[in-house]
Amino acid sequence: MVIALKNDDLEVQFKTFGGELSSIRSKEGIEYLWQGDPEYWSGQAPVLFPICGSVRNGQVQYHLKDGVKTGQLPRHGLIRKREFELKEQTDHRLVFEITSNDESLQNYPYHFRVEIAYELKGKEITITYRVQNLESDQVMPYFIGGHPAFRCPLLADEDYEDY
């Protein structure tokens, strides 16, 4: 599902799949966000969790209270290819949420909740990440990050080299 926030300056769109930005368009119709091209990179602005980047051979060892567990983590983590739940929406703000599930627990043995809040004010988009460890007795290592890609060149009379 695609959800939009609009004001007098921008229209910003988001996808519940991945909980990510999918469009940033000015009132003049200029698209700022990369729209994806499978020839180069089909992504737009994925949310990376519980890792940013890759791990050696895709394999991670977790040192838990009850022993060592091995898991497989794909590049940039587990949530960028999952459906998020829309928890809140106003005319200028929305909040997505995702939690651990049986599939994520197989390779990342921590019960978590991730909330991503997007807020549009004027020409600014504020993104706030909130990560919750739902197990109080187990330390939960993680990274979280955004990976937005911006369109370049923006205008028809520009070249990539202009940037």
Predicted regions and their residues:
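Surface-exposed acidic/polar loop and edge beta-strand patches at domain peripheries
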Residues: 1-126, 134-163
